[in-house]
A protein has these predicted regions:
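Sec-dependent N-terminal signal peptides
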Residues: 3-12
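Positively charged n-region of N-terminal signal peptides that target proteins for export
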Residues: 1-4, 42
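Sequence/structural signature of beta-propeller domains
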Residues: 17-301
Length: 301
């Protein structure tokens, strides 16, 4: 049996270290598939319990991988006619008919040179039974949205979908910690050759607090984000921390995100790259680009 490594994290507000609340984190498994070299996004399956989807970073194959809680690959799906220019995040959600789908964000732009970025959507694929080889399959033609920012090129590593409204969001990444949340427009019909223009919702600043006694990691750059399935929380990852906001009913996203978030610090995790919620809207799952790639579960009292 694979050992479960217990580590601990601290939960603090963004303004104080007092009232520290310990929480438990488990390194559930390491991914065994050597083809997953830089896990850059993670999404909870909406069809299969205990299954997550991930993908490689820029320049990798345009493929998504289904992984289970033993670290085994249960599917490898190549997105038809897709290109991995800089895939940075993925999420799960429903299409207009209520069918479970995977959304992949080719949204990275370190050099700020892309006129538009892409978001792909496919129906969530089948997976192989446990213990059977996961042969590569090719998806049907994906839905592809080409999107641009209203204020010029931006770099981003966070793709998230609000579970109640179905609206797709992108949270940008900044070396200075000055991120911004954008949403897709209400009308998703595109004219040929013209990208959709994203709508800016609010700015979010990550201050980059240092972790005492730890190797310095820049904590200002946002590397992943997700909405909770119940729509009541939003979590954003930096290289070494997680920040979680409560989203009260009756408040806009901009109003809720203007408040100080709770800060979670997963110990022994290097280069935190992706985060998603479990089905209970409280458990958090994270991966890292560090090899071997860990799958870590964070639970709170």
């Amino acid at each position: 049996m694979r050992p479960v490594f217990l580590i601990f994290l601290l939960l603090t507000t963004a303004s104080a270290q007092e009232g520290v609340t310990p929480s438990k984190s488990e390194r559930v498994t390491d991914l065994t598939d050597t083809r997953i070299k830089e896990s850059s996004g993670i999404a909870r399956s909406l069809r299969h319990d205990g299954i997550f989807w991930t993908h490689n970073d820029s320049g990798g194959e345009p493929c998504v991988f289904a992984i289970d809680l033993q670290g085994r690959t249960r599917a490898k799906v190549r997105l038809r006619e897709a290109v991995n220019f800089d895939w940075e995040d993925m999420t799960s959600g429903l299409d207009e008919q209520g069918a479970p789908c995977l959304f992949v964000g080719d949204i990275g732009d370190n050099l700020f040179i892309r006129r538009s970025v892409q978001v792909y959507r496919i129906l969530e694929p089948n997976i192989a039974p446990a213990g059977q080889p996961a042969a590569e399959t090719i998806s049907p033609q994906p839905q592809v949205w080409h999107v641009s920012y209203p204020n010029g090129s931006q770099n981003a590593e966070s793709l998230l979908i609000h579970p109640k409204t179905g609206r797709i969001h992108i949270l940008t990444k900044s070396n200075e910690g000055k991120s911004a949340l954008y949403g897709f427009p209400a009308a998703l019909t595109q004219k040929k050759g013209e990208p959709l223009i994203l709508e800016k919702i609010t700015d979010i600043t990550f201050t980059g607090e240092e972790r005492t006694g730890k190797r310095h990691v820049d904590d200002r750059m946002c590397t992943g984000a997700a909405f909770a399935p119940d729509g009541r929380h939003l979590v954003a990852a930096t290289y070494s921390s997680l920040y979680e906001w409560t989203l009260p009913e009756g408040q806009t996203l901009a109003e809720a995100l203007a408040k100080k978030p709770a800060r979670l610090i997963p110990e022994l995790v290097r280069q935190l790259e992706a985060v998603c919620y479990g089905a209970d809207s409280r458990t958090l799952w994270i991966t890292s680009e560090h090899l071997p790639t860990p799958l870590i579960r964070i639970t709170r009292d």
